A protein has these predicted regions:
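Glycine-rich beta-strand-to-loop/alpha-helix junction loops that act as flexible
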Residues: 12, 66-68, 89-92, 205
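ATP/nucleoside-binding phosphotransfer catalytic cores, i.e., glycine-rich phosphate-binding loops
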Residues: 19, 189-190, 195, 215, ...
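Internal helical hairpin/lid segments
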Residues: 199-227
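ATP/NTP phosphate-donor binding region
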Residues: 1-63, 73, 110-117
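Short beta->alpha linker loops
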Residues: 43-47, 67-70, 92, 148
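Short Gly/Thr/Asp-enriched flexible loops that form oxyanion-binding sites at enzyme active sites
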Residues: 71-84
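Catalytic core of DAGKc-family lipid kinases
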Residues: 33, 81-85, 91-199
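Short glycine-/acidic-enriched loop or helix-start segments at secondary-structure transitions
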Residues: 74-76, 98-99, 212-213
């Protein structure tokens, strides 16, 4: 029997640095279960994207994204382009995609044992992905696509590199509340155009965002629909 090959690509900074330790633990656990594992700890987001493209092009049994939703999003772009199986090892702050898929918030020996078994059995499940055309560029998403207040908060939080974890999002939210105004949106759904002002618009493949907020509670990542 051929030994399956799994590639772990981890964002070593995700989850306040926890993703690095989780990835090392995953490598050890999967290797002990008879999986040939290659671990990458890229130093930057651009390096992560380059490694993702290279790893997915080699068509291993699975490419495992270890980190938060941003890490999963970046690796997804490469995996879906060449139809490579993508797995998720939760290691970020929010882990909303993993949460929407029913994965545990904290990894354990049992989690890695089940993962190794799935890799050996070549077991995977098909899930939905959203395709977005942005300035002529095609982008894929597994979670919630949104615009408005939440996006403004996220953009502000990303600029607060001096703050860590969820605290910076709380600070960004309070700062954005002071100056945010509603915007006019035109949305076409099933051929019907809607125009209105809104604080935010969210389109969900998965139901969670923002670290567990159920913005689209009826969303199902396997029903072929966006909510």
């Amino acid at each position: 029997m051929t030994t399956p090959h799994a590639v772990i690509i981890a964002n070593p900074h995700a989850g306040g640095g926890r993703a690095r330790n989780i990835a090392v633990k995953a490598q050890s656990a999967l290797a002990s279960a008879g999986v040939n594992v290659t671990l990458h700890l890229p130093a930057s987001r651009e390096q992560l994207r380059v490694i993702s493209r290279q790893a997915c092009a080699e068509q291993p049994a699975v490419v495992l994204a270890c980190g938060g939703d941003g890490t999963v999003h970046d690796i997804l772009q490469s995996a879906i382009a060449v139809n490579t199986t993508l797995g998720i090892i939760p290691g970020g702050t929010g882990n909303d995609i993993a949460r929407s898929l029913g994965l545990p918030r904290k990894t354990s020996d049992s989690f890695f044992h089940k993962m190794a078994k799935s890799i050996h059995n070549q077991h995977c499940e098909l899930i939905d992905a959203s395709k977005i055309l942005r300035d002529g560029e095609q982008v894929w998403s597994l979670g919630v696509i949104s615009t408005g207040f939440d996006s403004a908060v996220n953009e502000r939080a990303n600029r607060m590199s001096h703050l860590r974890g969820t605290f910076r999002y709380i600070v960004a939210l309070l700062a954005e509340l002071r100056e945010f105004q509603c915007h006019q949106y035109t949305v076409t759904i099933d051929g019907v155009q809607h125009r209105d002002s809104a604080v935010l618009i969210a389109v969900g493949n998965g139901g969670n965002y923002g670290g567990g907020m159920r913005i689209c509670p009826q969303a199902d990542m396997k029903d072929g629909l966006l909510d």
